[in-house]
Amino acid sequence: MVQISEVKGNSRDNRTAAHTHIKGLGLRPDGTAEVSGDGWVGQAAAREACGVVVDLIKAKKMAGRAVLLAGGPGTGKTALALAVSQELGTKVPFCPIVGSEIYSAEVKKTEALMENFRRAIGLRVRETKEVYEGEVTELTPQEAENPLGGYGRTISHLIIGLKSAKGTKKLRLDPSIYEAIQKERVTVGDVIYIEANTGACKRVGRSDAYATEFDLEAEEYVPVPKGEVHKKKEIVQDVTLHDLDIANARPQGGQDVMSMMGQLMKPKKTEITDKLRQEINKVVNRYIDQGVAELVPGVLFIDEVHMLDIECFTYLNRALESSISPIVILASNRGHTVIRGTDDISAAHGIPPDLLARLLIIPTHPYSPDEIKTIIRLRAKTEGLNITDPALDKVAEHGSKVSLRYALQLLTPASILARVNGRPGGIEEADVTECEDLFLDSKRSAAIVNQDSEKFLY
């Protein structure tokens, strides 16, 4: 029996995340915010301010500065940072972290912070490769007297003729390339290419002009290359400074037993020294001076910045003043609170006043009932849910009275209840009411805890 099986596609279903609907900042060409665009509703002033920040980043005039997104929970601070990253595109590095991420048992706080700083700084390296490509028409090694004496002779250079569709060239090559040509077993009639910078030689195949020469031959025939024999290709590579740090910090293991055993054991996280970073900075600066590389300052986004302690804030002060630093976007939903790591020093947003004075602060404001309704309709469309107008009003009411997050979280359970209850028209008001009874919001839960406090442990 002939075996026939279906090949399944490897396309993945994208999960609808909290900010899937955000596609950009939703700005007009003149920089003013549209009422609703790119998944955004409201927050016009904050979006316009972020648009100015994006323009400064693109003009490379924002490096070493910091922005604070300040506002209550559910006002779109993380969404603004995500929109900034999408406006900048994939070529500009964007490194999002949470304030609590930098605490580790293996690596000190300031090291983890610096690591993320370096992740947010890109380096665009442009390399021009010169290549000679064509069919070999002549292969003549030139001999010379052996400089060590005796009767032996050495290869002084190699004369090679290359032919392409647009012309021919005769090259004088180094004897080291002759060895590479011998290894590749190149003969007249083969198509080869030689890299001028490295001297690497590669045999592509036999010219198709010789295809009828033999009846039986396990040879790959290729056409004569188009264009000139001498070609220039520009290769652009994007790396971050952290990639360079890691490449130089990890020592290559030897061949002895102890090195091999060390490689088998679980490796500890390497802490990159300040001296190594300074050496890499010197090399990077030299590349920039030569015009080989170009620095691309990216964005480091630190969410819940009030979770950093006083030592981290002090380090941030210094890091922002360094010659190579990215744009730092901070987000905090705290008002006047105690700075972490201190006993009783309180400040606005949980950030020390000296750092707060350096920040450009962008406020985010609570959404109006109409804006909440539009956001819920947009989320329902993104998640592929049908919702009736009375049900939408009910969910929007929860968004105004309780929180936008609670209202959005009711949508999916309500759609499941609507399907179970056999409602083809989508989510109805009864489904939202049933969901509301099944899942409590934070205020009702707190009221129950206060009412029945003796039934709980603490």
From Swiss-Prot:
Q: Which PANTHER family match?
A: RUVB-RELATED REPTIN AND PONTIN
Q: Which residues are noted in the entry as ATP-binding?
A: G71, G72, P73, G74, T75, G76, K77, T78
Keyword DNA damage attached: yes
Name its species: Emericella nidulans (strain FGSC A4 / ATCC 38163 / CBS 112.46 / NRRL 194 / M139)
Q: What does this protein do?
A: DNA helicase which participates in several chromatin remodeling complexes, including the SWR1 and the INO80 complexes. The SWR1 complex mediates the ATP-dependent exchange of histone H2A for the H2A variant HZT1 leading to transcriptional regulation of selected genes by chromatin remodeling. The INO80 complex remodels chromatin by shifting nucleosomes and is involved in DNA repair. Also involved in pre-rRNA processing.
One GO BP annotation is: DNA repair
Enzyme kind, highest EC tier: hydrolase
Which InterPro entries does the protein's record reference?
A: AAA+_ATPase, P-loop_NTPase, RuvB-like, RuvB-like_C, RuvBL1/2_DNA/RNA_bd_dom, TIP49_P-loop
Name the family the entry cites.
Belongs to the RuvB family.
Instruction: Give the protein's recorded name.
Output: RuvB-like helicase 1
Keywords of this entry: Activator, ATP-binding, Chromatin regulator, DNA damage, DNA repair, Helicase, Hydrolase, Nucleotide-binding, Nucleus, Transcription, Transcription regulation
Q: Where in the cell is it found?
A: Nucleus
Q: Which reaction does it catalyse?
A: ATP + H2O = ADP + phosphate + H(+)
Look up the EC number in the record and give it.
Answer: 3.6.4.12
Location of region: Disordered: 1-29
Q: Tell me a Gene Ontology molecular-function term this record carries.
A: DNA helicase activity
A Pfam family annotated for this UniProt entry = TIP49
GO cellular component, alphabetical, reads: Ino80 complex; NuA4 histone acetyltransferase complex; R2TP complex; Swr1 complex
Q: How does it assemble?
A: May form heterododecamers with RVB2. Component of the SWR1 chromatin remodeling complex, the INO80 chromatin remodeling complex, and of the R2TP complex.
